[in-house]
Amino acid sequence: MGIKLINIGFGNIVSANRLIAIVSPESAPIKRIIQEARDRGMLIDATYGRRTRAVIITDSDHVILSAVQPETVAHRLSTKGEEDEISEVEAQ
């Protein structure tokens, strides 16, 4: 199994194998998670100064802010998985 990478906007790429959740930043619990990650030094801001639209939580407890909609990131994740499955079938 190879490394799957997902584009989260502005040329920033995250390993799909490390993702736990892709959520909207609007709710109070998610805002609290963002602030706690900032305090711990585990926050990665990939928004380039734009509005945060998706919060990505990884298995290493890093919290990544993205300016791309959560649905877009999820779609990129699902289409990437389909492409990998197709290439694996063709290789057999």
UniProtKB/Swiss-Prot annotation:
Taxonomic placement: Bacteria, Bacillati, Bacillota, Clostridia, Eubacteriales
Taxonomy, superkingdom: Bacteria
Naturally occurring in which organism (per UniProt): Clostridium kluyveri (strain ATCC 8527 / DSM 555 / NBRC 12016 / NCIMB 10680 / K1)
UniProt record similarity statement: Belongs to the RemA family.
Protein name, entry field: Putative regulatory protein CKL_1364
Pfam families assigned to the protein according to its UniProt record, in alphabetical order: RemA-like (PF04025)
Chain ranges passing through the membrane: none
Cysteine pairings via disulfide bonds: none
